């Protein structure tokens, strides 16, 4: 029968108690008090029997009390009748008078009865047959009551464990049957518990709304979300899946509420102020200020009625917290300065009044300390830099006033007996100064440009010591909050070890820095060291931390690497994913056109420009570190930082891209006031309000509030405007359509008209007014650019035509206004520049030296006029009557052909024809007149100053005496112009032959950037100064296949001017005078059978350039049709070349002179 431990203990106690009573009875018998003892025994026996007779539940029954299978666990209780106990006790009481043999027999009988009962209990249990036989055998072998009791306890314990095991198996089978039944039942999920939970959540939401824990917007949104969760649960296949899904969704339910924002603010405070979150000791004043700021923000959060207001409160708190964090070093620095000023003032007063016995410095010290402590509390509460500066000035002013009043009161003549020095906290005690030890390691630091510098500062003292970094902060004032970082390795009152890091040193930041340490007694020790920044000799590659200066290498803390390699690899993979996002964001940003700096964009642009270099350095360093697993920076800490930095840089790139897009929208719809209003109120950054120092969650919140939200609003406005435009213009214009061609033609027309207007003004402008053309150019350029912008946005060809005519009208009006201003300021008529006077033709003018003979022209070399034109082969005339000086004349100038002389400037009046001499004497020939400076062609006219500052690019180049100037209408991606003359005579002769004769010179024009040739599209104006140039010049483009294309050109101020949209080989043909009078038929552009194949000598221009110029094939010329040159006027240019009339007169005079010489020789 199964019994509990409690029942066993009761039986054992009863038996022992009976024996004890018997012992008392024996003692009483011998002491004469038997009756009394019997009564005691009887009463106690009855009470004990009654207690023992009371049934108690077994342990198994207690454990399984309410279980349905408790009946299975009930065991037979050991019931000891009262009569049996009396029988067991009474014999013991009488043992004193009975013999030992009888007593022993009774005990054996009782023991045997106990064995039989125990065997019956064993038979009635669920033990196995083997276990039952084992227990029975042990019972039979046991003859001692204690051993039998121990065996009984062992049997009960075994039986109990067996029942427990049986019960567990039953429960396991029961659950298996339930699972099987559930799977076989209908798949419909029982949502009773889920509905109950969701209804509870709805009541919680209603309660939070009543207590203003959430806004009405959040309330409606959350209730709707709960219903959505209910619907999702109803569609689940399994109850477990539904419950998991409900828990997940309910966890997200409160993320956007005021409660979530409240938690975010409190977590930020905990992160900044908790000693567990910070390796450095948190400043107490900073912690208190941050907690006060958080408390105010939480109060404002409770008052918020909309989500926008609540989010704004949270973002404002993060901004203020960041500013508070940034100002803490300045507060400390200001407090240090204040204590330093007090100490210096007191020392100075003490020196001045040390012989004044009446001066009580203790009062002054007390007042000074009171002021310093008062303002120390105020400074710690400062929220911004202006407030901090104001309090600092007030404190110094008050401190100075107190000291001055004390000085005036006690300053007297020196006393004979000096007063004993007052001992005070901040006095300068010379004996104690040596007790402060201040060291800097390394003392002299050398780093390269762009690297970080690290050094360690150690201070030891017998009393409390503070470090003063004010000189360091002044000389390396950080532009961002984390440029200078301080990491205290040891930070006790009398021992401090600080590791200082200064990031990204510039070349001009070599400094000598002084650090100070001061103890409570006012002792100050200074330590000076130098930081030298050198320029990198090799290619500038952003260095990884392993490449830093060797002196600081050993000072870098060896951070333990992560033991969990799988976790570290997951972190690296996550950082690489953020890097890919960053590179993608930068690539998308580069596809957006850059915006020139302007008041609306200046601050934003400066922020982005400042981020470019750190971004590139971070990317390069990260890629290098992940490729070297042996690096000590291959740790979880550094990869977490890279990941965080990449996420911050993504936000910077997105803010820049959104800004550029909005500027494009504003240019597209410049009259839309709503777009401009949103941009200026939200996205426009100022010096006081920008995100330059924000990072992580603060930067993300700033981006969402001030960039993403307003951009989405602007984008919606633009989309609506675009739809409206599409409705007004039903048929979209395809790319490269006639409309696009019309726009391009219109732009070219406006540009050409502007150039034509400028050329006309420049020709008639007086030389002294050349500088004024700059203002005119700027006005015309502005009209052109605005017109081009309007043309791009035009929708119809009629609109384009109107824009072009409007531009012409505006340019004409601008030029008229400009000319009117010139007439008012300049009375002279600025028709033409002043021309040097043509020397009066002598009786027998002598032809200039080295005339250019048409029969054998040399194209490559330009004719030069010597300084003193002397004819080397002119014989001296033996007799020269009536001529004091015998001029040198040519031997016999050829009369059939007029000599080719350089052109002279156009004269206002026709030269006077001298009358034929009446005498046969040789006429007096004057000295050979110096030709005017005009034959030496002037340099290419310089463009007005500032021409390239308003959207144009100007390049110049020279080759010998040839100079070229090229003007682009817009900035060009090139930095140098190259001019080279192709001197292959056969090439020039072939081109001359195919174009109808004349002098031909071939030039190669090209552009380069960074020393490499580049090809730039776009129209450009070429001005080529060749030396002496005739008035009739043809320009040809030599194509890749050898064809010649005639390009419209003109001669202006001695320069050949033409326009083209590319560079290659150009042939310049100058027609001789005979050709100018009687133009050949070949000058008319025509297309005949075969083409001229000209192989170019230069390499890299075309594929055929490697061929020899002698590969010019015979055949007819193919000349593209073009406008005839505009330089066929009779008006002489300013080149010094005389007209045909002058040549004829000079030839006639030469003929007359020759006749006189011939007649003189006959006479002799």
UniProtKB/Swiss-Prot annotation:
Residues 1136-1164 form a propeptide. Residues 167-176, 183-220, 536-564 have a biased composition (Basic and acidic residues). SUPFAM superfamilies: Immunoglobulin. Residues 1-37 form the signal peptide. It is found in: Secreted, Cell wall. Residues 54-75, 167-220, 536-567, 823-947 are annotated as: Disordered. This is IgA FC receptor. It comes from Streptococcus agalactiae.
């Amino acid at each position: 029968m199964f019994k509990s431990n409690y029942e066993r203990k009761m039986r054992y106690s009863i038996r022992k108690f009976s024996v004890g009573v018997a012992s008392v009875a024996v003692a009483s018998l011998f002491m004469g008090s038997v009756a009394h003892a019997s009564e005691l025994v009887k009463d106690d026996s009855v009470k004990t029997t009654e207690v023992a007779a009371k049934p108690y539940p077994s342990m198994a029954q207690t454990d399984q009390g309410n279980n349905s299978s408790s009946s299975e666990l009930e065991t037979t209780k050991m019931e000891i009748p009262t009569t049996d106990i009396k029988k067991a006790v009474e014999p013991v009481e009488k043992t004193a008078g009975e013999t030992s043999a009888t007593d022993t027999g009774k005990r054996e009988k009782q023991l045997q009865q106990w064995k039989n009962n125990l065997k019956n209990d064993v038979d009635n249990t669920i033990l196995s047959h083997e276990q039952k036989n084992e227990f029975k055998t042990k019972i039979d072998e046991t003859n001692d009551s204690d051993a039998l009791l121990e065996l009984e306890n062992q049997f009960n314990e075994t039986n109990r464990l067996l029942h427990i095991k049986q019960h567990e198996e039953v429960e396991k089978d029961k659950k298996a049957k339930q699972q099987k039944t559930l799977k076989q039942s209908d798949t419909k999920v029982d949502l009773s518990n889920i509905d109950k939970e969701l209804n509870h959540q709805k009541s919680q939401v209603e309660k939070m709304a009543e207590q203003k824990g959430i806004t009405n917007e959040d309330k409606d949104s959350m209730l709707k979300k709960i219903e959505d969760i209910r619907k999702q649960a109803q569609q689940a296949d399994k109850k477990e899946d539904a419950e998991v899904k409900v828990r997940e969704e309910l966890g997200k339910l409160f993320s956007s509420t005021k409660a979530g924002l409240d938690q975010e603010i409190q977590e930020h405070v905990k992160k900044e102020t908790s000693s567990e979150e910070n390796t450095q000791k948190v400043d107490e004043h900073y912690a208190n200020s941050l907690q006060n700021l958080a408390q105010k923000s939480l109060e404002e959060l409770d008052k918020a009625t909309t989500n926008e207001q609540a989010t704004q409160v949270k973002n404002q708190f993060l901004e203020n917290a960041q500013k508070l964090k940034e100002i803490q070093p300045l507060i400390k620095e200001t407090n240090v300065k204040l204590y330093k000023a007090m100490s210096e003032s007191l020392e100075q007063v003490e020196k001045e009044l040390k012989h004044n016995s009446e001066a009580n410095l203790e009062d002054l010290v007390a007042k000074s300390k009171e002021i310093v402590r008062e303002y120390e509390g105020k400074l710690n509460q400062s929220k911004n830099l202006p407030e901090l500066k104001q309090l600092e000035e007030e404190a110094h002013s008050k401190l100075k006033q107190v000291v001055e009043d004390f000085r005036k009161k006690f300053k007297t003549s020196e006393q004979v007996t000096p007063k004993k020095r007052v001992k005070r906290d901040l006095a300068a005690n010379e004996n104690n100064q040596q007790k402060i030890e201040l060291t800097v390691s390394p003392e002299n630091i050398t780093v390269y440009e762009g690297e970080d510098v690290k050094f360690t500062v150690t201070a030891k003292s017998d009393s409390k010591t503070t470090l003063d970094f004010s000189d360091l902060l002044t000389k390396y004032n950080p532009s961002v909050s984390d440029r200078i970082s301080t990491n205290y390795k040891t930070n006790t009152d009398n021992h401090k070890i600080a590791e200082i890091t200064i990031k990204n040193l510039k070349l001009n930041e070599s400094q000598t820095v002084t650090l100070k340490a001061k103890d409570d007694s006012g002792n100050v020790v200074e330590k000076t060291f130098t930081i030298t920044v050198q320029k990198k000799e090799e290619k500038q590659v952003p260095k990884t931390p392993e490449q830093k200066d060797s002196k600081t290498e050993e000072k870098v803390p060896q951070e333990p690497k992560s033991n969990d390699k799988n976790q570290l690899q997951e972190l690296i993979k996550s950082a690489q994913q953020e890097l890919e996002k960053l590179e993608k964001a930068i690539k998308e940003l580069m596809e957006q056109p850059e915006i020139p700096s302007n008041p609306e964009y200046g601050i934003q642009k400066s922020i982005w420009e400042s981020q470019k270099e750190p971004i590139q350095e971070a990317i390069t360093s990260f890629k290098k570190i992940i490729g070297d697993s042996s690096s000590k920076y291959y740790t979880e800490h550094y990869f977490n930082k890279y990941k965080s930095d990449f996420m911050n840089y993504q936000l910077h790139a997105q803010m820049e891209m959104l800004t550029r897009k909005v500027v494009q929208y504003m240019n597209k719809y410049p009259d839309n006031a709503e777009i401009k209003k949103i941009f200026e109120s939200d996205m426009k950054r100022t010096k006081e309000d920008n995100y330059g120092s924000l990072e992580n969650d603060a930067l993300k919140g700033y981006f969402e509030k001030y960039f993403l939200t307003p951009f989405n609003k602007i984008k919606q406005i633009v989309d609506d405007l675009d739809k409206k435009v599409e409705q007004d213009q039903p048929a979209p214009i395809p790319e490269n359509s006639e409309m696009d061609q019309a726009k391009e033609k219109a732009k070219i027309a406006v540009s050409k008209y502007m150039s034509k207007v400028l050329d006309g003004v420049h020709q008639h402008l007086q030389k002294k007014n050349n500088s004024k053309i700059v203002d005119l150019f700027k006005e015309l350029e502005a009209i052109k650019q605005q017109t081009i912008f309007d043309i791009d946005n035009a929708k119809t060809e009629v609109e384009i035509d109107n824009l072009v005519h409007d531009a012409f009208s505006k340019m004409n009006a601008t030029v008229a206004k400009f000319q009117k201003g010139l007439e008012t300021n300049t009375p002279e008529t600025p028709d033409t520049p002043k021309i040097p006077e043509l020397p009066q033709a002598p009786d027998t003018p002598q032809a200039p030296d080295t005339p250019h003979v048409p029969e054998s022209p040399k194209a490559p070399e330009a004719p030069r006029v010597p300084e003193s034109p002397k004819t080397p082969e002119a014989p001296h005339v033996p007799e020269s009557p009536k001529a004091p000086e015998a001029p040198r004349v040519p031997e016999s100038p050829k009369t059939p052909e007029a000599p080719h002389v350089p052109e002279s400037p156009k004269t206002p009046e026709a030269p006077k024809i001298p009358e034929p001499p009446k005498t046969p004497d040789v006429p007096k020939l004057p000295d050979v007149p110096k030709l005017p400076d005009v034959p030496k062609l002037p340099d290419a006219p310089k463009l007005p100053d500032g021409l390239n500052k308003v959207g144009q690019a100007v390049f110049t180049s020279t080759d010998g005496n040839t100079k070229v100037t090229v003007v682009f209408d817009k900035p060009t991606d090139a930095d140098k112009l190259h001019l080279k003359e192709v001197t292959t005579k056969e090439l020039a002769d072939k081109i001359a032959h195919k174009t109808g004769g004349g002098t031909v010179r071939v030039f190669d024009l090209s552009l380069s950037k960074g020393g490499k040739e580049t090809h730039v599209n776009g129209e450009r104006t070429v001005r080529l100064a060749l030396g002496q140039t005739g008035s009739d010049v043809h320009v040809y483009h030599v194509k890749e296949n050898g064809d010649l294309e005639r390009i419209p050109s003109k001669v202006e101020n001695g320069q050949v001017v033409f326009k083209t949209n590319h560079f290659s080989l150009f042939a310049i043909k100058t027609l001789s005078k005979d050709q100018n009078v009687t133009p050949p038929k070949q000058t008319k552009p025509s297309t005949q059978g075969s083409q001229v194949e000209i192989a170019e000598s230069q390499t890299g221009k075309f594929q055929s350039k490697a061929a020899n110029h002698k590969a010019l094939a015979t055949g007819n010329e193919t000349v593209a049709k073009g406008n005839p040159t505009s330089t066929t006027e009779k008006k002489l240019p300013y080149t010094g070349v005389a007209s045909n009339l002058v040549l004829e007169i000079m030839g006639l005079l030469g003929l007359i002179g020759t006749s006189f010489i011939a007649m003189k020789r006959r006479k002799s």
